[in-house]
Amino acid sequence: MPLKLRVAGVDEAGRGPLAGAVFAAAVILDPAKPIAGLADSKVLSEAQRDELAVLIKRDALAWCVASASVEEIDKLNILHATMLAMTRAVEGLPVRPDLAQIDGNRVPKHLPVPGEAIVKGDAKVAAISAASILAKTARDAELVALDALHPQYGFARHKGYPTAEHLAAIEAHGVLPAHRKTFGPVKAWLASHQGALF
């Protein structure tokens, strides 16, 4: 009987926000320790995600969370930075998978193992759901920490997304080093303020 493939699920969080790094996670689930309630992180409440993240870290065969910085996003563009974060997450796994199943329609070019793209994989594949939860909770934690440093921007509430509150805060208080300079609203503010950073 052939050996069962060791599959890592891979997903990202934070492609759309105007601030903060983009995060990715890779998870190899343990078939002997199924985790109930895994679903795409976007359909779970914050409390559910936090609870599941603890279980995933405890019961998965292996997991890794990685990121690509704001500087890397601005240098490479968000797509390439996301692929870089995903590659780092797979490379960082303490157990090498036979296959990486990636949420979405493309596989990172420099992945260290064979990859398979699965559209809406975060809703179809348990390991990808687990990865989406770890990536999202790690990213949210970074934005909560950023909120503690700059409470006037409301990062803990909008998590860096271009909400009316966030855009108003940029207009009132300016652009921070944590903002992505190549993203439309940030770029526009910098252009109208001669590139000033606060």
Curated annotation (Swiss-Prot):
Instruction: Please list the GO terms describing molecular function.
Output: manganese ion binding; RNA binding; RNA-DNA hybrid ribonuclease activity
Subcellular localization, as worded in the UniProt entry: Cytoplasm
Keyword Cell inner membrane carried by entry: no
State the EC number(s). Answer: 3.1.26.4
The Gene Ontology CC terms held by the record are:
cytoplasm; ribonuclease H2 complex
Q: Which cofactor does it need?
A: Mn(2+); Mg(2+)
Q: What are the protein's UniProt keywords?
A: Cytoplasm, Endonuclease, Hydrolase, Manganese, Metal-binding, Nuclease
Task: Identify the residues that the record assigns to the RNase H type-2 domain, covering every copy.
Answer: 5-195
Matching InterPro entries, A to Z?
RNase_HII, RNase_HII/HIII, RNase_HII/HIII_dom, RNaseH-like_sf, RNaseH_sf
Q: Which SUPFAM superfamilies match?
A: Ribonuclease H-like
Say which enzyme class the record assigns: hydrolase
Is the keyword Cell wall biogenesis/degradation assigned to this protein?
no
Q: How is the cofactor bound?
A: Manganese or magnesium. Binds 1 divalent metal ion per monomer in the absence of substrate. May bind a second metal ion after substrate binding.
Its BP terms in the Gene Ontology are: DNA replication, removal of RNA primer; mismatch repair
User: What is this protein called in UniProt?
Assistant: Ribonuclease HII
